[in-house]
């Protein structure tokens, strides 16, 4: 049995669905929301690499590396903001973050 494009797309669709459900079903914990966003970006990267490999060019793989770099920076900045927020408020609940609005 050969692993084809449909297998990669199925795995990516499952990861994308898990990430989307994680965002919509969990409205209390910011860390879980950030992890769900990372799952969505991982699904996008799997699609980019799969399409790139099956078409025979490297543009999708280079773009996937760019997306990985941006996702790592986004996660680092998001976690740094959460650490500072936790030090100030003592909680990282979404309701407390909504209280920061102007």
Curated annotation (Swiss-Prot):
It is found in: Cell inner membrane. One of its GO terms (biological process) is ATP synthesis coupled electron transport. It catalyses: a quinone + NADH + 5 H(+)(in) = a quinol + NAD(+) + 4 H(+)(out). The keyword Protease does not apply. It is an enzyme of class 7 (translocase). It comes from the Bacteria. Its main location: membrane. One of its GO terms (molecular function) is quinone binding. Its EC number is 7.1.1.-. GO terms for cellular component: NADH dehydrogenase complex; plasma membrane. Keywords: Cell inner membrane, Cell membrane, Membrane, NAD, Quinone, Translocase, Transmembrane, Transmembrane helix, Transport, Ubiquinone. It is a multi-pass membrane protein. The chain crosses the membrane at residues 5-25, 31-51, 66-86. NDH-1 is composed of 14 different subunits. Subunits NuoA, H, J, K, L, M, N constitute the membrane sector of the complex. Belongs to the complex I subunit 4L family. NDH-1 shuttles electrons from NADH, via FMN and iron-sulfur (Fe-S) centers, to quinones in the respiratory chain. The immediate electron acceptor for the enzyme in this species is believed to be ubiquinone. Couples the redox reaction to proton translocation (for every two electrons transferred, four hydrogen ions are translocated across the cytoplasmic membrane), and thus conserves the redox energy in a proton gradient. PANTHER family: NADH DEHYDROGENASE SUBUNIT 4L-RELATED (PTHR11434:SF21), NADH-UBIQUINONE OXIDOREDUCTASE SUBUNIT ND4L (PTHR11434). This is NADH-quinone oxidoreductase subunit K. It comes from Azorhizobium caulinodans (strain ATCC 43989 / DSM 5975 / JCM 20966 / LMG 6465 / NBRC 14845 / NCIMB 13405 / ORS 571). The lineage of its organism: Bacteria, Pseudomonadati, Pseudomonadota, Alphaproteobacteria, Hyphomicrobiales.
């Amino acid at each position: 049995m050969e692993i084809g494009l449909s297998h990669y797309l199925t795995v990516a669709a499952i990861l994308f669905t898990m990430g989307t459900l994680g965002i919509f079903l969990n409205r209390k914990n910011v860390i879980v929301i950030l992890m769900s966003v990372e799952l969505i970006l991982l699904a996008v990267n799997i699609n980019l690499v799969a399409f790139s490999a099956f078409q025979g060019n490297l543009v999708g793989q280079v773009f996937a590396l760019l997306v990985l770099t941006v996702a790592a920076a986004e996660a680092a900045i998001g976690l740094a903001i959460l650490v500072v927020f936790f030090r100030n408020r003592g909680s990282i609940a979404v309701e407390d973050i909504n209280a920061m609005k102007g």
